[in-house]
Amino acid sequence: MTKILAADDSVSIRQMVSHTLKDAGYDVETANDGSDALKKAQATKFDVVISDVNMPIMGGLELVKALRGNPQYKFTPILMLTTETSAEKKQQGKAAGATGWLVKPFNPDTLLKTLKRVI
Amino acid sequence: MALDMNQLRKMFFEECRENLEVLETELLGIQPENVDPETINTIFRAAHSIKGGAATFNLLDISEFTHAMEAYLDEVRNEKLSLTSHSVDVLLRGGDCIKEMLVGHENDAPVDPELRSTVTNELKKLLESDTDSSSTESAPVEDSATVVDQNAPRVGWHVNFLPHQDLFFSGNDPLRIIGELLEIDASAEVVCDSSKLPPLAGFEAELCYLSWQVNLDGMIEEDAIKEIFEWVEDQCDLHITPQYGDLESAQTDTATAAEPEAVVEKTVSTEPQPMAESASVTKVAEKTPEKATAEDKPQRAAKADSSVSSIRVDIDKVDNLINLVGELVITQSMLTEIGNDFSNDKIGKLKSGLDQLLQNTKELQENVLNIRMLPMSFAFSRFPRLVRDLSSRLEKQVNLVISGEHTELDKTVLERIVDPLVHLVRNGIDHGLELPDVRTESGKDPMGTISLNAYHQGGAIVIEVKDDGAGIDCDRLWNKAMEKGVVSSDMRREEMTDKQVLNLIFAPGFSTANEVSDISGRGVGMDVVRRNIEELGGHIEVESAVGVGSSFTISLPLTLAILDGQLVKVAGEVYVIPLITIVESIQIDTQCVKLASGGIELYRLREENIPILRLHEEFGLGESGSLDGRLLCLVEAAGNRIGLLLDELLGQQQVVIKSLESNYTKVSGISGATILGDGSVSLILDIQGLITAFKRRQADGSSGGIAA
């Protein structure tokens, strides 16, 4: 089963992402922020990582950089789930090593569709 | 498992409140001239989360409004604009607006649009120099560019896709992209160009050397193709060209595949980005109205159970509980083992097992109660804002000192103590603290101090509200009380101690303010404060010194589920008196008993006459007989003292309160029941109720009054 790690500091968004993915039959783990996600990603190998950009302690961009530095996650799809739509932010995400982005407002169908693009 | 939107929505509301609190707390702590970038980040994040969540849950008014705040904060974060005390004010009011909108969504209550538009305008003004960034996202931009070539007879698309070598490092995969193209057009023609593959010796497995030519059906929208390449557009050379008219060009396309460089040089398209983006925004905007109405309905239906409140519990507390339950199960199985095959020589084991059970039960009880415990900061956190607003309105300088905010208190008690605390703090600033020049004149620091402190004392929590203001002048208070008829005209000032006079401020209908201001004195007096506190089983005391300040001390039980009780015996029945109400217990010396008019027995104890209430008669348990040498338990409620005549004092113990009202019916003089160790039911005395009933009887029967 495809293992997905979803990081977001908002409980409601986290729950929603996790419900949606579980409903669709994925194996999901969630993290409260970047550093939590990094810890979890180091413990288990995930097939896809979905992360918010703005989070306390460790933000999404830092998380991507850290994950890309780990040989296990060199090629793993990492999607940014964000409200930031500016080209500049997306560019920053890209530069950090993100695979793609999902623009909030979060929509379950879009999430699943986007996810299909990477697995 | 279906997505429970209502549940999630509720969670979002809760979360949003937390974010608002963060926003407010951080903003209040800011000194505009010296702002820590991390603070701005925290504030930005709070606003950002509110916006994101609100958009997700289709609360578009909130997300749009918050967007303006976020846009401004973003500029501050990027050091393009700097915070001023004015902008902090605007942001604080913005937080208020969001709060109002939240409540509006929860209760279907209309929101004052005026406040919202004022704040929005002010935010716009703050952003003046940089307004354009706020409009790009929320307003759907209709893009006409996509329509341009729709009229032309297009027979196909020619897509030339040359990934950069490092494409894999972003987690993207060209094969997935090709796969997606095949999904929108199953008959697409795909040609792979492997001419760039190096000889095996120089081959690096992690790099991408291939490129592709894909010919797609002309009926497909260009945007659909661009969307597929959206993520990799800057990691590849991409060229999408429409093919018109005849078949020839399509064939030449396949021919050019051999020399891809030529095509690349001609056209490296960077266009798709903005177009694809606006397209996706439009889609979202189209969807929202119908979705909003669809989701509003269940929300409204769920309104009825909005009173069902939830509590967020620290995971450590839950872990602890689980551990304890585990222990309990072990102890239980140990005891079962002993019981299965019991003989007298196992009595020692049984005893130690029972001890363990006792220990487990105790800890479990404590931990379960602990779940409902929240730190005082939940109540205290609103005060910085309150003080800030009040001090500027009253032109007073106030320094708020908060301590003990980590002290934990039962959620219900905490929620119900907030209003009384707000009242006390308001009073302290409005009536207590003097204006800065008055303070300077009397040699004080022009800045007054209000302190809030909470700490545990025994089984209770004590909350203090102190000010270093003018203090309460007892003589003036007395005159005022006479004027308002709060004390009967035959009372004399000398008969009362200063403390008793001070207690008059808790009398109904008494206000110390000369004028009713919009801040205090709106009819909710200190009597309500005291009543609220006493309903929680607590009490309040006041101390004050002229020129030095006043101090209110509130004692509250930690929880409403359990109380520390004194077991007493009256005519063979065991009753429980809440320990917190007991002042002292004395053996009656008949020489101190006097008979007042109306047949009331008064006990003279250190300058004070305390009426005696014979519980035997009160509860119809027979005659109580002579007072000589009997026990008198002195209890106090609402500043009134009374002596309860008892037969015997038993032990003190914590009792679990069971409601009599919900299981039987309300009984006057009894606040509840509990079950004792031997299984018998014992009634818990309602001291306040007993005193009130006693006073009422007395007022009916004679003109004399209880000396308060």
Regions found by a protein language model. Give the residues of each.
Chain A
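C-terminal output helix
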Residues: F106-L115
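Charged docking surfaces used in two-component/phosphorelay signaling
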Residues: Q15-D23
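Active-site residues of response regulator receiver
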Residues: D52, T82
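Active-site beta3 strand of CheY-like receiver
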Residues: K45-I50
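Short, glycine/charged-rich "phosphate-handling" switch motifs in NTP-dependent
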Residues: T99
